[in-house]
Amino acid sequence: MKLFAQGTSLDLSHPHVMGILNVTPDSFSDGGTHNSLIDAVKHANLMINAGATIIDVGGESTRPGAAEVSVEEELQRVIPVVEAIAQRFEVWISVDTSKPEVIRESAKVGAHIINDIRSLSEPGALEAAAETGLPVCLMHMQGNPKTMQEAPKYDDVFAEVNRYFIEQIARCEQAGIAKEKLLLDPGFGFGKNLSHNYSLLARLAEFHHFNLPLLVGMSRKSMIGQLLNVGPSERLSGSLACAVIAAMQGAHIIRVHDVKETVEAMRVVEATLSAKENKRYE
């Protein structure tokens, strides 16, 4: 399985680590730390050196209760960073946005993936994504970031997320986005309580029936904090456990804050999966 964008390809035969680069003042875990262009590029460089093969740039916090950001503000935050990374590094760049203007401008300056938590539901986003021809990650969310964690409710969380993916894939194909350009993200922590999150993690492998890349983001989230009763800065071990559980089930892209540690964990996963395939247990 491969993704193609900007004249390059990403081989998904092994798990990739996507490093999170929030250029926001209010993200839940690292808001305000990479706001200047120099700081953002430095942090991207650190993550690339640690083994990240994708950098996910986000200019609007999507934590529960987050305030919305204007188009102008998001463009000012995101575009210079995407452009600077594209000019300096041989790395895939993902842009975490829902706005058509940011989708278009990001593509022009070198972005490879559109990572939209709203699955191109904002007016004009679907058309903008189709125009760029870039791969798109579709994510499931119940409600919106402001209200999603108030009282998430499902009869069957796996069935509902699965049905959502079916509908969104069809919607993208009708708009001219080829199925092979799509990635799927179950949306851990987006309109889901503790039991919903772990139900999805336990059944992650079942989403392979779509034959599309799976992207997961659980790093430092409340599904770990609530379980272990620790704050965001103390969630590394839980984040690594979630990353390993996902990768052992064939997740293709793991979106994280702690790149070095996750890359090392993925090497252990790869060695295990390859031993399983080869039936070599020396």
UniProtKB/Swiss-Prot annotation:
It catalyses: (7,8-dihydropterin-6-yl)methyl diphosphate + 4-aminobenzoate = 7,8-dihydropteroate + diphosphate. Pathway: Cofactor biosynthesis; tetrahydrofolate biosynthesis; 7,8-dihydrofolate from 2-amino-4-hydroxy-6-hydroxymethyl-7,8-dihydropteridine diphosphate and 4-aminobenzoate: step 1/2. Magnesium is required for activity, even if it seems to interact primarily with the substrate. Optimum pH is 8.5. Keywords: Folate biosynthesis, Magnesium, Metal-binding, Transferase. Sulfonamide drugs, for example sulfamethoxazole, act as competitive inhibitors of dihydropteroate synthase activity. Inhibited by 8-mercaptoguanine (8MG) derivatives. (7,8-dihydropterin-6-yl)methyl diphosphate binds at residues 62, 96, 115, 185, 221, 255-257. It is an enzyme of class 2 (transferase). It comes from the Bacteria. GO terms for cellular component: cytoplasm; cytosol. Mg(2+) binds at residue 22. It holds the Pfam family Pterin_bind. Residues 15-267 form the Pterin-binding domain. Changing residue 62 to A: Increases resistance to some sulfonamide antibiotics, including sulfanilamide (SAA) in E.coli strain BW25113. GO terms for biological process: folic acid biosynthetic process; response to xenobiotic stimulus; tetrahydrofolate biosynthetic process. Its cofactor is Mg(2+). 6-hydroxymethyl-7,8-dihydropterin binds at residues 115, 185, 223. PROSITE patterns: DHPS_1, DHPS_2, PTERIN_BINDING. Its EC number is 2.5.1.15. Belongs to the DHPS family. Homodimer. This is Dihydropteroate synthase. The gene is folP.
